[in-house]
Design a protein with these regions (language model features):
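Short intrinsically disordered, low-complexity coil segments enriched in acidic
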Residues: 1-8, 184
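Acidic/polar low-complexity surface segments
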Residues: 10-15, 31-57, 75-81, 124, ...
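Detector for repetitive beta-architecture
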Residues: 2-4, 15, 22, 27-29, ...
Length: 184
């Protein structure tokens, strides 16, 4: 079935934190609850680190594997903290993936994100807003792959890149790759 996580952290505590153990969802969707968006994430929301230094959604050696849709939204607070921060693979075998993060940095990924498998055409969308850092940062160890389209939208303010992509970005079956980055 479906898995829905909603959390709000305080100083030093992430809104939602997955650690050490894999998260596997068979036959369902995985959602970290979101909120209405105005220019990124406008207000506090489930999955938000409300006060102090913390990530909105943090993954530490806890691979995520889902058969259905993945929808994750996170808002971080304070210097150095991202809306979404993941060092583990995020995979949907038969669904689309949407990641939306806002914080000092928007979305930071150091492991692969993969939407779809085989001939199933599925899409990957990532939107990141960094108030003092990168909108989207993907390391060389973090290829962003979809069988369908890939859309990456990053807004970096002050000292960040809109899109800081060090790894591969690819569509393996049929889809467009759309990159949109802005830095101010």
């Amino acid at each position: 079935g479906d898995v829905v996580l909603s959390g709000q952290g305080g100083a030093g505590l992430a809104g939602v934190y997955l650690r050490t153990n894999p998260l596997t969802v068979s036959g369902g969707n995985f959602t970290v609850q979101g909120a209405s968006l105005v220019g990124g994430i406008a207000t506090g929301m489930p999955g938000t680190a409300a006060t102090g230094g913390s990530y909105g959604f943090q993954v530490n050696t806890a691979p995520i594997s889902v058969s259905g849709e993945i929808d994750i939204r996170g808002q971080g607070t304070s210097a150095g903290y991202f809306g979404i921060f993941s060092d583990s693979t995020i995979t949907s075998t038969a669904g689309n993936i949407s990641l939306i993060g806002k914080g000092d940095g928007g979305v930071s990924l150091t492991a692969a994100v993969t939407a779809g498998s085989g001939a199933l055409v599925r899409n990957l969308s990532i939107v990141g807003t960094g108030t003092a850092g990168d909108g989207i940062h993907a390391s060389a160890a973090a290829p962003l792959v979809a069988t369908g389209g890939v859309s990456l939208t990053g807004y970096g303010m002050t000292v960040g890149f809109g899109l800081n992509l060090l790894g591969a970005v690819s569509s393996t079956v049929a889809g467009d790759i759309v990159l949109s980055g802005r830095a101010t």
